[in-house]
Amino acid sequence: MSVKHFLNTQDWSRPELDALLDQARAFKQSKLGDQLKGKAVALVFFNPSMRTRTSFELGTFQLGGHAVVLQPGKDAWPIEFDLGTVMDGDTEEHIAEVAKVLARYADILAVRAFPKFVDWQVDRQDRVLQAFAKYSPVPVINMETITHPCQELAHILALQEHFGTTDLRGKKYVLTWTYHPKIGRAHV
């Protein structure tokens, strides 16, 4: 059986996404549950986060699980992503090992890794997230790389609640966000 990762919404069917939204609605009603009882979630942050980290840590706890936060290069060894690289520089671990080792400890891996915003041809490969998915035998959740599928679902749920319907066809809205200096300077 293949592992079902949540890397982007395009990999999931409409009925699967609708089922996730239905489950999110149910979670909002009850606040606490045991769906993750006895489960561990490894949250791997290559970039800072406030809302996403808080949401995932508290969400894991509220569903009965335990989250561990790792920040490669800060409180965990830096990770190498290129195959065949001699590991004599800044990186101490290779993704092929890291993903498998973390999967022995955790039931789910969640990854946040922004692209470099230098070369779109490189960034669009989403190498960090794709490497975790390639080597992990447990599900990988994208906490934001070049896409933010969990935030996409949160937006859809908010719009459905605002409009009072799950059918958003023909509904008009404005989506805006705060300027991010790193992304704002990108040539993508």
Give the predicted meaning of each segment.
Residues 1-54, 58:
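Positively charged, low-complexity intrinsically disordered leader regions
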Residues 9, 45-46, 121, 143-144, ...:
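Glycine- and other small-residue-rich loops at beta-strand/loop junctions that grip anionic moieties
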Residues 25-29, 156-164:
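Generic structural signal for well-ordered alpha-helical scaffold segments
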Residues 36-42, 50-160:
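Phosphate/diphosphate ligand-binding glycine-rich loop within oxidoreductases
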Residues 8-11, 71, 167:
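Short, solvent-exposed coil/turn linker segments
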Residues 46-66, 160-187:
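Glycine-rich phosphate/diphosphate-binding loop of Rossmann-like nucleotide-binding domains
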